[in-house]
Design a protein with these regions (language model features):
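Active-site lining segments of carbohydrate-active enzymes
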Residues: 174-296, 309, 410-416
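Carbohydrate-active enzyme catalytic cores, enriched for enzymes
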Residues: 304-475, 647-649, 659
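Non-membrane alpha-helical segments in proteins
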Residues: 123-137, 149-153, 189-197
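Solvent-exposed loop and edge beta-strand segments that line ligand/cofactor-binding
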Residues: 112-125, 136, 172-189, 234-249, ...
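Extreme N-terminal leader/anchor segments
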Residues: 2, 10-13, 17-85, 130-136, ...
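Long, well-ordered core segments of solenoidal/helical folds
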Residues: 89-100, 147-165, 212-237, 271-291, ...
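CBM-like, beta-strand-rich accessory domains located in the C-terminal region of large
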Residues: 165-168, 189, 382-396, 482-673
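Structural helix-adjacent loops and short alpha-helical linkers that scaffold large soluble proteins
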Residues: 135-148, 198-219, 259-277, 314-330, ...
């Protein structure tokens, strides 16, 4: 299916957007949850009187980024983290900085490759982050120079925007960036904030040994970030002409932090803050009351998580005047990833999300927010990732996040805790169920099932799909995110196997793929209980029934019902039992398929299939109401490095062939000890 240019610009899975011809693009005042909490105090006039009346240095002090002159703070930075960073920084020195060549930038348009250029830019950023951290701790000229070199390298980079995001090709047909009209994307905001934090920390030493560098940083930030932010209403992620996603808080938070640290005009900072809050309110307004993020946990860190970090910055800049900790949706959103935790580094993943933690999540900020809101389960969830002898943060999270973690002594001293692992979660806004037999334990099975729509951010065609974990480890899986290319956010997105409904554990009436867009939905017939709503009593079976006929291009009135039942009390054999029952009534006879996607060793034996990985095993049986159904097995030999990192060398699709205008099919999953 190919979207029209107009539909593509408004799609939740388009790469970036230039407003369709005739679209009204204007900034009109917005009133959402933030305005409901703060009222006119978040508007420019009030902020001009509060923030604008402070000195620029007072505002900088409030955001808690310590200068290199704060030797007491840097002497107390986590030694384990600094030791790791120093070792990597020593390896950096003496080698050339990565080349972000024009030919690499042009590959996005020429052959669809975006990863090679992105790796070069990321390498530059991470090397600079390491250099700044080591310079701050050691106060040695060698490292101050290394950091200055990195700052100059980024200042001389033609663009801070990525080729997959830059609008120069859409506007002017360029394969290179338009340096006259720079685009403000995620990475432009990241680099501006990174340079601003570096300037805040090392500025006193750069004044002595690198005069002119700080002025260069300010010039580039002005040209590439502040001026576009203040003058361009067509930037789609501002929310003035289309819906927003994780780009909104991610960019806004970085722009705001950079403005506070680099601008000497407090009144201008107040104006930027007012514009940023008006835009952020549009993002907060799209968050559902249950706190669910339709992009999943992987994007929570760089979406809702960025919102939390920005709100922390807002509270700091306003000296506590604008405090978001009491806004209900903020608290529910904070709890979302904790509710999706399967155990260890495994999570319920949807859309373009990974099933496993990548190992460099910035755990300090949910720990801090759990403390700010008094939510002990959130702090416990964060502490579950705080392993003895391991760094408090990773450079991959960026310099601002690294510095906040390094100087947070409460996070440094936090002791590992057991993850809360809620027993029952039901998020009606995205129709996601998570169920296990007992809270706080990975023992036994866990079920996650999903309804929703095929118009979600970073959408996969996954309506009616489910995953099963044993001992916290996914065995029936959601494939998740492969490496991004130009195809990923184009009209050809659903040619990618991982995003097709046929490669989710979902049915395929007549062998069909699910449809694309808001018209294709699942309907909840019977909803389970689970937090943040009422929770079923311990031992009571969970039941979710979905109507999936609307997920497929079927004749009106055709029905495909799927019912999920989780029985934590155990089957007759003494094991927990998950039952997935399909019933259909269609207008015509035909052949249908039911798919299961498995990770690990898949062993068929008669009408039983066993799946095993990392010492955990499940058995799968299926029948059509008359006799057992034996699946055929299709092996996907993975060649994508991101998928291999999660699943190993292969995935296996179990294909059950069924048929009839009317019929039923039941799948049973049990744990094997």
């Amino acid at each position: 299916m190919t979207r029209s240019p107009e539909a593509d610009a408004l799609s939740r899975v388009s790469a970036h957007a230039v407003p369709p011809r005739g679209t009204a693009v204007r900034h009109a005042e917005f009133r959402g949850p933030l305005f409901a909490e703060w009222g006119s105090e978040m508007r420019e006039e009030a902020l001009g009187a509060t923030v604008g009346s402070a000195t620029a240095e007072t505002l900088r002090e409030r955001v808690r980024i310590p200068s290199i002159d704060r030797r007491d703070v840097w002497a107390d930075a986590d030694p384990i983290t600094i030791e790791r960073i120093t070792a990597a920084a020593e390896a950096d020195r003496g080698r050339p900085w990565a080349d972000a060549l024009g030919s690499l930038f042009a590959r996005y348009v020429r052959d669809g490759d975006r990863a090679t250029y992105e790796r070069a830019v990321s390498d530059r950023q991470e090397r600079l982050t390491r250099a700044v951290a080591v310079a701050a701790v050691t106060d040695q000229q060698t490292w101050i120079d290394e950091a200055a070199d990195g700052a100059v390298v980024l200042c001389e980079q033609s663009t801070w925007s990525l080729p997959a995001h830059d609008d120069a090709h859409a506007r002017r047909g360029f394969v290179l960036p338009d340096v006259i009209s720079p685009y403000l994307d995620l990475v432009a905001g990241e680099i501006a904030a990174q340079l601003a934090v570096a300037d805040r920390i090392l500025g006193p030493r750069w004044d002595e040994s690198w005069p002119g560098l700080r002025e260069r940083i300010r010039h580039e930030a002005e040209t590439r970030v502040f001026t576009p932010f203040e003058t361009r209403d067509d930037l789609w992620w501002l929310g003035y002409w289309r819906e927003v996603n994780n780009w909104n808080p991610w960019i806004l938070g970085n722009v705001l932090l950079a403005a506070v640290l680099l601008l000497d005009d407090a009144e201008r900072v107040a104006r930027i803050l007012a514009r940023a809050l008006d835009s952020l309110d549009r993002y907060v307004a799209e968050l559902p009351g249950d706190g669910a993020i339709d992009e999943g946990v992987a994007y929570w860190w760089n979406g809702a998580g960025r919102m939390l970090e920005m709100l922390d910055t807002v509270a700091a800049i306003t000296d506590g005047g604008l405090d978001a900790t009491r806004i209900p949706v903020v608290g529910e959103t904070l709890r979302f990833p904790m509710r999706m935790h399967l155990g260890g580094d495994w999570y319920v993943n949807v859309a373009d999300g990974w099933a496993r933690s990548r190992g460099h999540e910035p755990w300090q900020f949910p720990f801090r927010w759990g403390s700010l809101t008094g939510d002990g389960r959130v702090t416990e969830w964060a502490r579950a990732a705080r392993r003895p002898g391991q760094p408090v943060a990773d450079v991959a999270g960026g310099l601002p996040r690294l510095v906040r973690a390094l100087v947070d002594t409460a996070w440094r001293d936090a002791v590992a805790a057991a993850a809360p692992l809620p027993a029952a979660v039901w998020l009606p806004s995205v129709q996601v169920l998570v169920r296990r037999s007992a809270a706080g334990s990975v023992a036994g099975l866990a079920l996650a099932a999903k309804g929703g729509t095929n118009d979600e951010n970073h959408n996969h065609k996954d309506l009616g799909s489910f995953l099963v974990a044993a001992g916290g480890r996914q065995l029936l899986v959601d494939v998740g995110k492969p490496t991004y290319t130009a195809q990923t956010f184009s009209a050809e997105r659903y040619r990618i196997r991982a995003m097709q409904s046929g490669w989710h554990s979902a049915p395929a009436p007549y062998g069909l793929e699910q449809g694309e867009g808001p018209a294709f939905t699942a309907q909840v017939i019977t909803a389970p209980q689970g937090e943040p709503g009422p929770v079923s009593p311990a031992g009571e079976a969970a039941l979710l029934e979905l109507e999936l006929g609307g997920a497929y291009p079927l004749v009106a009135g055709d029905s495909w019902r799927r019912t999920f039942r989780f029985d934590g009390s155990g089957s007759a054999g003494g094991t927990e039992r998950i039952e997935v029952a399909d019933r259909w009534r269609l207008s015509e006879d035909g052949a249908h398929r039911v798919h299961l996607i498995a990770a690990g060793e898949v062993t068929p034996s008669g009408d039983v299939v066993e799946v095993a990985a990392d010492g955990h095993r499940i058995r799968i049986t299926a029948d059509d109401g008359n006799a057992p159904v034996v699946p055929s097995l299709e092996v996907w030999e993975l060649d994508d490095p991101e998928l291999i990192a999660v699943w190993g060398p292969r995935l296996t699709r179990l294909v059950y062939d069924v048929g009839g205008r009317v019929g039923s099919f039941t799948t049973v999953i049990e744990e094997l000890s």
